Swiss-Prot record:
Keyword Mitochondrion among record annotations: no
Annotated source species: Prochlorococcus marinus subsp. pastoris (strain CCMP1986 / NIES-2087 / MED4)
Subunit structure: The 4 large subunits of the cytochrome b6-f complex are cytochrome b6, subunit IV (17 kDa polypeptide, PetD), cytochrome f and the Rieske protein, while the 4 small subunits are PetG, PetL, PetM and PetN. The complex functions as a dimer.
Keywords from the named record: Electron transport, Membrane, Photosynthesis, Thylakoid, Transmembrane, Transmembrane helix, Transport
Protein name: Cytochrome b6-f complex subunit 8
Major localization listed first in the record, in broad terms: membrane
Annotated localization: Cellular thylakoid membrane
Functional description taken from the UniProt entry: Component of the cytochrome b6-f complex, which mediates electron transfer between photosystem II (PSII) and photosystem I (PSI), cyclic electron flow around PSI, and state transitions.
Residue ranges of the TM segments: 3-23
Membrane-protein topology: Single-pass membrane protein
Entry's family note: Belongs to the PetN family.
GO biological process, one term: cytochrome complex assembly
GO cellular component: cytochrome b6f complex; plasma membrane-derived thylakoid membrane
GO molecular function terms attached to this record: electron transporter, transferring electrons within cytochrome b6/f complex of photosystem II activity
Primary gene name: petN
């Protein structure tokens, strides 16, 4: 069960990170580029 929880935590972290990257990218900051 621990592996299952770690997997979900990692998935949520990656999802949140990708959303944040899209938001920051659309803000026109320019300091963060991918």
């Amino acid at each position: 069960m621990m592996i299952f929880q770690i997997g979900w935590a990692a998935l949520a972290a990656i999802f949140t990170f990708s959303i944040a990257m899209v938001v920051w990218g659309r803000n026109g900051d320019g300091s963060i580029d991918i």
